[in-house]
């Protein structure tokens, strides 16, 4: 979980509490605190609460638990004279911007603000791949019109902490930030950029800001840009930033927002409602709460509420990105009450667990297979589509072409295993039990998992009977009497392949045969191979 370092006295003085009370409060916020020195503490915060990555976000939440402030905070929001226009940027198409005025920064709060930015980069931003943030001194921006657009790599500006003009290409090649993040956003020789109307660069996200708009302790008015690959992510990140800064006493200003989106102003500061009944809360918490009590606890968690009949309608603030459904509100109530105040209850239903029929079959089959002289292997369920036949599930945007499909049979992965183990001492006896994914129109997705077993023998001399005798004995040990029916398939040598039939049910339960030399040559396997695949789904039901 993310950890932040905070100036202890910011928290204690704003909340008017002791060190011990601070520890108790943070525990109620699912956070842990430990001292670093006389003035600083390290706080471990949950990933799902990015609004707590900044001390003033913690102060806002803690004031609710203490009962000092209830409901959603009301911020001073005005319309700005500034505009922010988003042009087409193919590599990172989404951008939003906001302004916060009249903040007071000192050495500690400046460090905490930069830390806040970096924690958001690492978590929500996925190391700037999904979201990147630029924080600027608004008073150093000379134009009221600001643009997000692509720039050529020979465009020049002075990057942060540099003293000379550099091209974007030089920044990427010569600065630590450029070497780390430069490959994220460059597309077709162009880089995303935040630019003033006069052409001055404010930043080239996700790499670096311009030195022109560097923030320091004298900064009082801030311009924030947030860019990335997800509109939802960039807009919610900006909401978190401006509302946390507003807790310092800052005043939020909305920019005129010109973009392909339907929104006219930025930040969006969107709210939504979640309705929850008293019965649902009581059932999940195990205690009976009245509607008035539910309202009280939710307002302590800094939500605005409205009671409609037996339901509480909860307005979720823009910065609470962790609230997705009713159960999240139940957790908020539990945290506000305090988990130490909730008594555990014994289960009223007692039952004895046992292995499933599928697990029993797998264990028995594994023992029988090892007893028959086979060694077990484990291969990936993902495979290369060139190895598969018939219909299979393809992977969208695979990490590597080697794993761009889901196997629909265990045979291709076993053959691939044998290909890379031809150096082993012969003969090679191997088996695998695992899932494949096959077509099934009766399911919602059109596909289903199917449990199978595969057996293979590779040797300088091997034939159908060498494997058939072993597979036959294994099936007989499972109380299955198999019969064999000729099976013609390109995979097998003609006349040397068969379907395996469960005699009692007249159901096909597998195939067996000698692999065609043509296929072996394609796979670069130099030894004869005989293989059998057993369909275990029908056997589980016995």
From Swiss-Prot:
Its EC number is 6.1.1.20. GO terms for biological process: phenylalanyl-tRNA aminoacylation. Mg(2+) binds at residues 322, 328, 331-332. Coiled coil: none annotated. GO terms for molecular function: ATP binding; magnesium ion binding; phenylalanine-tRNA ligase activity; RNA binding. Keywords: Aminoacyl-tRNA synthetase, ATP-binding, Cytoplasm, Ligase, Magnesium, Metal-binding, Nucleotide-binding, Protein biosynthesis. Signal peptide: none annotated. GO terms for cellular component: phenylalanine-tRNA ligase complex. It is found in: Cytoplasm. Residues 269-344 form the B5 domain. The keyword Ligase applies. It catalyses: tRNA(Phe) + L-phenylalanine + ATP = L-phenylalanyl-tRNA(Phe) + AMP + diphosphate + H(+). CDD domains: PheRS_beta_core. Its cofactor is Mg(2+). The keyword Transit peptide does not apply. Tetramer of two alpha and two beta subunits. Belongs to the phenylalanyl-tRNA synthetase beta subunit family. Type 2 subfamily. This is Phenylalanine--tRNA ligase beta subunit. It comes from Sulfolobus acidocaldarius (strain ATCC 33909 / DSM 639 / JCM 8929 / NBRC 15157 / NCIMB 11770). The gene is pheT.
């Amino acid at each position: 979980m993310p950890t932040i370092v905070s100036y202890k006295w910011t928290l204690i003085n704003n909340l008017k509490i002791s060190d011990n009370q601070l520890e108790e409060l943070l525990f109620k916020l699912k956070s842990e605190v430990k001292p670093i020195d006389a003035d600083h503490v390290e706080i471990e915060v949950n990933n799902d609460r990015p609004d707590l990555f900044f001390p003033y976000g913690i102060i806002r939440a803690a004031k609710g638990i203490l009962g000092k402030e209830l409901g959603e905070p009301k911020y001073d929001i005005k319309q700005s004279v500034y505009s922010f226009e988003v042009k087409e940027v193919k590599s990172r198409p989404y951008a939003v911007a906001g302004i916060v005025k009249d903040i007071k920064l000192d050495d500690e709060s400046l460090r905490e603000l930069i830390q806040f930015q970096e924690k958001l980069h690492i978590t929500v931003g996925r190391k700037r791949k999904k979201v990147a943030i630029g924080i600027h001194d608004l008073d150093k921006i000379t134009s009221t019109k600001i643009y997000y657009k692509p720039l050529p790599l020979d465009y020049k500006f002075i990057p942060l902490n540099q003293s000379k003009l550099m091209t974007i290409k030089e920044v990427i090649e010569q600065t630590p930030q450029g070497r780390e993040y430069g490959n994220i956003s460059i597309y077709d020789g162009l880089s995303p950029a935040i630019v003033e109307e006069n052409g001055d660069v404010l930043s080239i996200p996700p790499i670096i800001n311009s030195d022109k708009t560097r923030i320091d302790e004298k900064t009082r008015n801030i311009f924030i840009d947030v860019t990335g690959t997800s509109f939802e992510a960039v807009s919610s990140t900006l909401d978190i930033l401006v509302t946390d800064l507003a807790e310092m006493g800052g005043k939020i200003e909305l920019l005129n927002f010109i973009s392909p989106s339907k929104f006219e102003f930025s930040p969006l500061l969107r709210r939504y409602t979640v309705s929850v009944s008293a019965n649902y809360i009581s059932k999940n918490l195990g205690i009976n709460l009245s509607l008035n009590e539910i309202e009280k606890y939710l307002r302590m968690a800094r939500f605005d509420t409205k009671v409609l009949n037996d339901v509480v309608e909860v307005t979720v603030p823009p910065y609470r990105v962790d609230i997705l459904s009713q159960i999240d509100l139940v957790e908020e109530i539990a945290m506000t009450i305090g988990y130490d105040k909730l008594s555990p209850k014994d289960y009223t239903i007692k039952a004895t667990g046992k292995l499933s029929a599928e697990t029993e079959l797998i264990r028995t089959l594994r023992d029988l297979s090892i007893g028959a002289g086979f060694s077990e292997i484990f291969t990936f369920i993902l495979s290369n589509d060139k190895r598969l036949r018939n219909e299979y599930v393809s992977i969208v945007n695979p990490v590597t072409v080697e794993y761009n499909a889901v196997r629909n049979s265990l045979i291709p992965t076993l053959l691939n295993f044998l290909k890379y183990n031809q150096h082993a001492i012969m003969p090679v006896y191997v088996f695998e039990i695992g899932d494949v994914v096959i077509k099934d129109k009766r399911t919602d997705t059109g596909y289903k998992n199917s449990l199978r077993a595969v057996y293979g023998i590779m040797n300088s001399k091997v034939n159908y009977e060498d494997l058939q005798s072993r597979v036959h004995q294994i099936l007989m040990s499972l109380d299955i009497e198999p019969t064999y029916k000729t099976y013609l398939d390109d995979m097998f040598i003609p006349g040397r392949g068969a379907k395996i039939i469960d005699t009692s049910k007249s159901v096909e339960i597998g195939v067996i045969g000698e692999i065609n030399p043509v296929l072996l040559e394609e796979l670069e396997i130099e030894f004869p191979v005989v293989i059998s695949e057993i369909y275990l789904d029908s056997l589980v039901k016995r």
